[in-house]
UniProtKB/Swiss-Prot annotation:
A Gly-cisPro motif from one monomer fits into the active site of the other monomer to allow specific chiral rejection of L-amino acids. This is D-aminoacyl-tRNA deacylase. It is an enzyme of class 3 (hydrolase). It comes from the Eukaryota.
Length: 150
């Protein structure tokens, strides 16, 4: 499982012409589920994201507070392309990306764990499997990659 976390001052997801979800201050997560990912990977990375100290304290010292301590929000977007292999040729190989139904199930479990830890109203979602337009304002910029196998 791979996650690209971006610290944002705002983010939104649009499908077609409709904004389907949006957040203010928090994290936008791009989430890739691999063929060998299990519930243990979901547990590991959901805990890591919820406890990750990506925010300054009141005195301005960095990396001191987690998402709940700043009353932040999370916007998750399913992103199978994070599992691409690019070591051979000029075209990405997506064989390591989990296929539809099982990926959706694991992604749903990941979302449930984030909501349980942060609150239903604090975790938003894109549309699984849809072609989406993602807009964000990256703060810092802070972009961190998490990998459950690393």
């Amino acid at each position: 499982m791979r996650i690209v976390l971006q610290k944002v001052s705002e983010a939104s997801v649009t499908v077609g012409s409709a904004v389907v979800s949006q957040i203010k201050h928090g994290y936008m997560l791009l989430v890739g589920i691999g063929t060998d990912d299990k519930l243990e990977d979901i547990d590991k990375l959901s805990k890591k994201i919820l406890t990750f100290r990506g925010f300054d304290d009141d005195a301005g010292y960095g990396w001191k507070r987690n998402i709940s301590e700043v009353d932040g929000e999370i916007l998750c977007v399913s992103q199978f392309t994070l599992m691409a292999r690019t070591s051979k040729g000029t075209k990405p190989d997506f064989h390591l990306a989990q296929r539809g139904e099982l990926a959706n199930e694991l992604y749903g479990q990941f979302m449930d764990k984030l909501k349980a830890g942060l609150g239903d109203d604090k975790v938003q979602n894109g549309v699984f499997g849809a072609m989406m337009s993602c807009k964000l304002t990256n703060e810092g910029p802070v972009t961190i990659i998490f990998d459950s196998k690393a």
